[in-house]
């Protein structure tokens, strides 16, 4: 298919050996799952970040009903998202969940028995570094969170200068990661800018934005990017959460729509790739590579929230 066709209009291409999550042959992989680690946008939520809608935008309670059915069956759902720490408490309250992993794995919020709230930053490679003289390894300067520490370094302004009119920060303050929209060469940014920074940082492309906050010169497609301490990832956050639950990998399922989400497959017994993710050639290649390496990857046959409900139904049927 021509590269000029927008991703949202492309037909999903399923790599050989990737079974539908609803296939009878997949039931054995799903039978032991007790925790679902799920991306939100493009996965659990309908386009536009909606819960009470289907993929086409029509009013629907199907996803809410699936969440209730999973909880009633004793299956825990944990959002693992690029959204900010500030949204965690609301997600836990509104969706009746006990854990939220935000900022691409940099923030974990837990609601413990009795209502006690526990939150922590996951700072990756920084945990072994002295961020200022006189501080212990991994200790942040007083009054600063990782997002503020990164901002204070000036790296965001250097990125804007390197990619004028092609990179913009979301205005909402965060806790760990910086979030941007635009269209830039991530490898060039890492090579020419981030490699020179005093503290190790990583910048990655989290895919196309189907509802971008603005437009770019030449109508370039708008991507979302995250800048965060090196070593931070959804994979590391899931490993941290699994350890706290004493949860074996084969009791965990992860689901998402991007190549970044595929990292979660390394900490779960099975991964489900969304049908909308399989419109992207980069995702198709990444899925094929992980299948060739022996990882267990399934796919939904329907996009976004409709595919998430498909996964939930298959999971319940396998019990």
Specify the residue positions occupied by each region the protein language model found.
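Proline-centered loop/turn at the N-terminus of a beta-strand
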Residues: 74-76, 99, 202, 251, ...
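Charged, glycine/proline-rich intrinsically disordered loops and linkers
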Residues: 114-150, 205-223, 281-295
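The start of beta-strands in P-loop NTPase/AAA+ ATPase cores
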Residues: 34-36, 98, 252
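Glycine-rich phosphate-binding "P-loop"
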Residues: 44-57, 222-229
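Mg2+-dependent phosphoryl-transfer enzymes with acidic/Ser/Thr/Gly-rich catalytic loops
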Residues: 6-20, 26, 31, 60, ...
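Conserved acidic, metal-coordinating active-site core of Asp-based
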Residues: 151-253, 258-267
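Asp-based phosphoryl-transfer active-site loop
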Residues: 29-53, 79, 265
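Active-site phosphate-binding/coordination module
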Residues: 47, 58-169
